[in-house]
A protein has these predicted regions:
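Acidic, metal/ion-coordinating pockets
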Residues: 1-169
């Protein structure tokens, strides 16, 4: 993993979302190890933190535009963190209503602090090339909460790009 983090950095990648369905494949220790490698390589990351008080979000000023990044995954393939785990993974727990509300509240709060909010979201069925109903509904909620850009991953195939309008537009 350390070599991969270094190679990503060398390739010009500066930010990664580690909230994916594979984030806990090697349990909490694997997640913490991954975060350590990313930190050593100088790669910013969203979606998880090595400690409960660590930040899972990231902001950066790019050309005078303050951009906030939030990372989440819809599921962790049935793996979960033990209640005593110190690390944090942002998950929606298979579109759980409370988890979605928490994410929308985070988007709204970040919108108050930044010029642009990008949500990096690992969701959708593998190899489905169409936007699913749950994805569409969540994307609209995020847009209404203030997300300017929603970057979806997880399906392993290209999906259509859509422009959404929020309720207040």
């Amino acid at each position: 993993p350390g070599v991969l983090a270094d190679n990503l950095k060398s390739a010009g990648i500066s930010l990664v979302n580690i909230a994916t369905n594979h984030a806990l494949d090697s349990d909490a220790a694997g997640l913490v190890s991954t975060i350590g490698y990313l930190d050593q390589a100088g790669l910013a990351h969203v979606g998880a933190a090595a400690t409960a008080d660590g930040s899972t979000d990231y902001t950066q000023n790019v050309g005078g535009v303050n951009i906030g990044f939030i990372g989440y995954t819809n599921s962790s393939n049935g793996y979960s963190l033990d209640s005593d785990a110190e690390c944090v993974l942002n998950t929606l727990n298979d579109y759980d209503a409370q988890s979605i509300e928490t994410l929308c509240n985070r988007v709204s709060a970040m919108k108050d602090e930044t010029d642009l909010v990008a949500v990096m979201l690992n969701f959708g069925s593998v190899e489905s090339d169409s936007i699913e109903t749950d994805q569409q509904a969540l994307a609209q909620k995020l847009c209404d909460a203030g997300a300017d850009l929603i970057l979806g991953t997880g399906s392993r195939v290209m999906k259509p790009v859509e422009k959404l309008s929020s309720e207040d537009e």
